[in-house]
Amino acid sequence: MTRISPKNSQYFPSPESKGGWQFLDKKIDKKVVSKINFEHLNKVIEEYKLFFDNVASGIVIVKDGFLVKEHYSFMTLPGSRFDVWSCTKSFTGIAWGLLLEESNNGTLPDNIKVDLDSFAYSFFPDSFKMTDKRKEKITIGHLLSMTSGIPGENELVFGIPPLDNFGPFEHALGYQENRYGYKTDQLISEPGTIWDYSDPAMAHLSILFKLIMRREMHEYMQEKVFDKIGIENASWDVHGGGQFIGPHTSAHVGLHISARELARVGYLLMQNGKWADDEVVPSSWIEKATKPSQTLNPEYGFTFWVNTHGTRWPGLPVDMFSLEGYNTNRCYVIPSKELVVVRVGSGPNQWNEQLFIKQVLKAIN
């Protein structure tokens, strides 16, 4: 098979079942090889192994479209899937970017019109009661940028864990406290005036997606994104159902995916949403989502973490952005370096990821 350099033409990896990523061949891909200090890169991975090989994890490094390095700890394989926790939020953001584009194109069911300034609660049926009058001012943009005023981590509201006799979406909508006694019925501020990392706010986006698109978000993403870029083995949790609201796609956590397949998403974003001849995700949405979405926390775009002002990762490129989840599940994208770095795992909660990326960049010019 003829090897294709992504620097000279548009290269996109086939699905894993059909060969997957092209590995860097030191004898053939001399142009790319000349840019990489393999001795230093190997040292970076060895140091990582020394500290973190006691937990299940995987690392994939893609440069110029080639898989230049990967590492898996004990009992972990290239196909091993991990719950990437809040990286899921960025997938929700991608889904909403597609929904907004469909609105622009007039292809939503019943030609519904939606934009970032649309009031979220205007799409809920009357049966969804509003627990705080101020919620009528919450926009789609507020939900995607964590500025809705719906209680989140600042108020010790983590996830959407329900009581035994209520569902998770009942808690997210403010109808019932969670199993730890925390409530979301009242906003902590007027929408757009405070930044708070809120899982209940993200849960709103799942219900709204179904109401507007008439499809569950995970089903839509499978067709519109996953199938097109060769993601074959990812799965997405759903919440609720039975006598409770739902079941609906989990918007804040619950995507299970391998390091290699998560790297496909990073590569898609690095290519401004293009995959081969198909614009899978609108480039205009990627541009908007990977820049600060508001001034309250300029390190947060629309569901992506960003470095536009050089404050999130000082000393690293300002075009760098990431998908981030608990247990340091990460997908870093640096378009100016044509670099994607993925780390998936079951821990630790924190590590010096900034130093790790700096050392990877030192090895890859």
Name each model-derived stretch.
Residues 72, 78-79, 154-242, 248-253:
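Catalytic-site signature segments of enzymes, centered on catalytic residues
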Residues 201-208, 253-275, 329-345:
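Active-site-proximal alpha-helical segments within enzyme catalytic domains
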Residues 221-222, 226-291:
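Active-site-proximal binding-pocket segments
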Residues 65, 83-116, 143, 205-209, ...:
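Active-site SXXK
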Residues 232-233, 238, 291-340:
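Active-site Gly/Thr loop motif
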Residues 83, 102-151, 211-252:
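Active-site helix/loop module of the DD-peptidase/beta-lactamase fold
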Residues 1-77, 101-113, 215, 361-365:
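N-terminal leader/targeting segments and the immediately adjacent pre-domain N-terminus
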Residues 323-365:
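Structured C-terminal helix/loop/strand segments within mature extracytoplasmic catalytic/sensor domains
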